């Protein structure tokens, strides 16, 4: 089973997620906590726009 890892702009590990939806939910909470009112159409485009990174472990 794949596992997704999310890192911020400093490559600090932000979390492990079993699904892309779990990672998206985390990012939605992050947006809310940071008062980010931008629209997130695509999870991976949003990660790139905030200069974060992700990796997949199979």
Show where each model-derived region lies.
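Short, mixed-charge low-complexity intrinsically disordered segments
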Residues: 30-58
């Amino acid at each position: 089973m794949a596992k997704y890892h999310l890192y911020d702009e400093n490559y600090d590990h932000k979390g492990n997620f079993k699904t892309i939806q779990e990672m998206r939910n985390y990012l939605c909470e992050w947006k809310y906590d940071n008062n980010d009112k931008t629209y997130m159409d695509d999870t991976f485009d949003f990660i790139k726009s905030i200069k974060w990174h992700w990796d997949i472990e199979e």
